[in-house]
């Protein structure tokens, strides 16, 4: 079974520097998507993404790994471990007019039924994440906390 790569792209009407800062700093991630994320932004540094009581399911989880590549305002690549072995997530940025194209790819899923299910979940999650990033940077809208029953 060959598990496909995840690939999403979005255009965000925001300067590339602002998109970069939002994707490569703890403050950036925590302002729109996570709660308690930590980033040591350098090649060989680390990223630890944390969600607390997130979304309609009130999920609390974390994942992270090693930062592989940092080219300011162009490329941010890290490994994390949502599957049975690490996968590689790459954000590639490109200036388009007054906005920014963001291309996200995730590669390296092991070939198993369990990892296929994880890949499907991450594909949906990354699509949601880029939509939330766009809404935040263009309109200041965040998902917010969902009340408990």
Which positions does each model-derived feature cover?
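Hydrophobic pocket/interface hotspot
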Residues: 19-20, 29, 47-49, 67, ...
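Hydrophobic ligand-binding cavity/cleft-lining segments
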Residues: 1-38
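A short, structured loop/turn motif at beta-sheet edges
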Residues: 16-17, 40-42, 68-74, 92-101
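Short, highly charged C-terminal tails/helix-capping segments
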Residues: 135-149
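Hydrophobic/aromatic beta-strand elements that line small-molecule binding cavities or substrate pockets
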Residues: 8-10, 37, 62-68, 88-95
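Beta-strand/loop substructures that line and gate deep hydrophobic ligand-binding cavities in soluble
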Residues: 81-128
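Glycine-rich portal/gate segments that line the openings of hydrophobic small-molecule binding cavities
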Residues: 39-79
């Amino acid at each position: 079974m060959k598990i496909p790569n995840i690939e999403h792209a979005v255009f965000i009407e925001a300067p590339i520097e602002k998109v970069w800062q939002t994707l490569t700093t703890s403050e950036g991630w925590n302002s729109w998507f996570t709660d308690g994320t930590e980033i040591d932004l350098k090649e060989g540094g680390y990223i630890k993404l944390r969600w607390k009581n997130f979304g309609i399911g009130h999920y609390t989880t974390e994942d992270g790994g090693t930062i592989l590549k940092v080219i300011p305002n162009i490329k941010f690549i890290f490994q994390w471990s949502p599957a049975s072995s690490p996968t590689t997530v790459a954000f590639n940025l490109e200036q388009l007019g007054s906005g920014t194209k963001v291309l996200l790819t995730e590669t390296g899923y092991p070939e198993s039924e369990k990892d296929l299910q994880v890949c499907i979940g991450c594909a949906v999650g990354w699509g949601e994440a880029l939509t939330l990033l766009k809404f935040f940077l263009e309109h200041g809208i965040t998902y917010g906390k969902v009340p408990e029953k």
